[in-house]
A protein has these predicted regions:
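Low-complexity, Gly/Ser/Thr/Pro- and Asn/Asp-enriched, turn/coil-prone segments
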Residues: 1-42
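C-terminal, surface-exposed recognition/capping segments
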Residues: 25, 30-183
Length: 183
């Protein structure tokens, strides 16, 4: 959904990243040519990395602003070490979870609220807002149909390779630290 609450255009895939950037309000759904992906399979689509694992931004495609990047698996594993029950945010009323990373969860520890945003399926349908969410990582999980992501719902939290590249998930950027390595 766009900020003005109108629905995005849904267009059959595949499409190149360069073409997709020309039309930011389009959602590219799967096609008969590409059942699991809206573009070619490319682990370095959003963030690049050297052979020894140093992460650096692919500024052409990265959805995060300068100084920020998509999370690596370690970022999600660290974040999801401790978390709250599935709750409504006191200010917004949106369902989700509080995450406190390495600190045992409690109301007086540093924490961050991640909302259950739902997702847009490969056919372009909106699904499960306030019930479930997947947050993208920068890590491809091998094969055409797998991307690592932080997943949670009312009774589960997991970092899992169960996401499909063609589905629209939430993006939560993390601070980009120069020279940081993938783990």
């Amino acid at each position: 959904m766009r900020p003005d609450k109108t629905t995005a255009d849904i267009t059959p895939a595949p499409v190149t990243p360069a073409e997709a950037r020309k039309h930011p309000n389009r959602f590219y759904a799967r096609s008969d040519m590409s059942l699991f992906n809206w573009t070619s399979n490319d682990m370095k689509l959003w963030n690049n990395f050297t052979d020894d694992g140093i992460i650096f931004k692919n500024t052409d495609n990265d959805p995060c602003p300068k100084g920020w990047r998509l999370p690596e698996l370690f970022d999600f594993y660290s974040l999801a070490a401790n978390y709250s029950n599935f709750v409504q945010h006191p200010d917004t009323g949106q369902w989700g979870r509080w995450f406190s990373g390495p600190n045992p969860y409690g109301p007086n520890v540093p924490r961050i609220f991640l909302p259950a945003t739902g997702l847009r399926t490969r056919d372009g349908a909106s699904y499960a807002r306030d019930k479930v969410t997947h947050y993208w990582s920068l890590r491809h999980a091998g094969g055409e149909g797998l991307i690592w992501n932080l997943y949670f719902c009312d009774d589960e939290v997991d970092v899992t390779p169960s996401a499909f590249p063609h589905e629209a998930f939430a993006v939560r950027c993390v601070k980009d630290i120069e020279g940081q390595r993938m783990r």
